Amino acid sequence: MSREGFQIPTNLDAAAAGTSQARTATLKYICAECSSKLSLSRTDAVRCKDCGHRILLKARTKRLVQFEAR
């Protein structure tokens, strides 16, 4: 695309709104030391909020997981 073909976007409010709404997806973990359940987002430190232990296990899903045997 050449420079002459580039047009400045006119709807900057919609573009700015998309970047400011970051998804705050949190994952559920279980502490390996004290077995407390906690949720961590992407920017949180990987550390238990109760005891400070650094080993966290990912919690199992509530959905039915079924595999076919051969």
UniProtKB/Swiss-Prot annotation:
It is found in: Nucleus, Nucleolus; Peroxisome. GO terms for cellular component: cytoplasm; nucleolus; nucleoplasm; nucleus; peroxisome; RNA polymerase I complex; RNA polymerase II, core complex; RNA polymerase III complex. The keyword Zinc applies. Belongs to the archaeal Rpo12/eukaryotic RPC10 RNA polymerase subunit family. The N-terminus is blocked. Component of the RNA polymerase I (Pol I), RNA polymerase II (Pol II) and RNA polymerase III (Pol III) complexes. Component of the RNA polymerase I (Pol I) complex consisting of 14 subunits: RPA135, RPA190, RPC40, RPA14, RPB5, RPO26, RPA43, RPB8, RPA12, RPB10, RPC19, RPC10, RPA49 and RPA34. The complex is composed of a horseshoe-shaped core containing ten subunits (RPA135, RPA190, RPB5, RPO26, RPB8, RPB10, RPC10, RPA12, RPC19 and RPC40) where RPA135 and RPA190 form the DNA-binding cleft. Present with 907 molecules/cell in log phase SD medium. Disulfide bonds: none annotated. One of its GO terms (biological process) is transcription initiation at RNA polymerase III promoter. GO terms for molecular function: DNA binding; DNA-directed RNA polymerase activity; zinc ion binding. It comes from the Eukaryota. This is DNA-directed RNA polymerases I, II, and III subunit RPABC4. Keywords: DNA-directed RNA polymerase, Metal-binding, Nucleus, Peroxisome, Ribosome biogenesis, Transcription, Zinc, Zinc-finger. It comes from Saccharomyces cerevisiae (strain ATCC 204508 / S288c) (Baker's yeast). A zinc finger (C4-type) spans 31-51. DNA-dependent RNA polymerases catalyze the transcription of DNA into RNA using the four ribonucleoside triphosphates as substrates. Common component of RNA polymerases I, II and III which synthesize ribosomal RNA precursors, mRNA precursors and many functional non-coding RNAs, and a small RNAs, such as 5S rRNA and tRNAs, respectively. RNA polymerases are composed of mobile elements that move relative to each other. In Pol II, the core element with the central large cleft comprises RPB3, RBP10, RPB11, RPB12 and regions of RPB1 and RPB2 forming the active center. Pfam families: Zn_ribbon_RPAB4. InterPro entries: RNAP_P/RPABC4, RPABC4, RPABC4/Spt4. Zn(2+) binds at C31, C34, C48, C51.
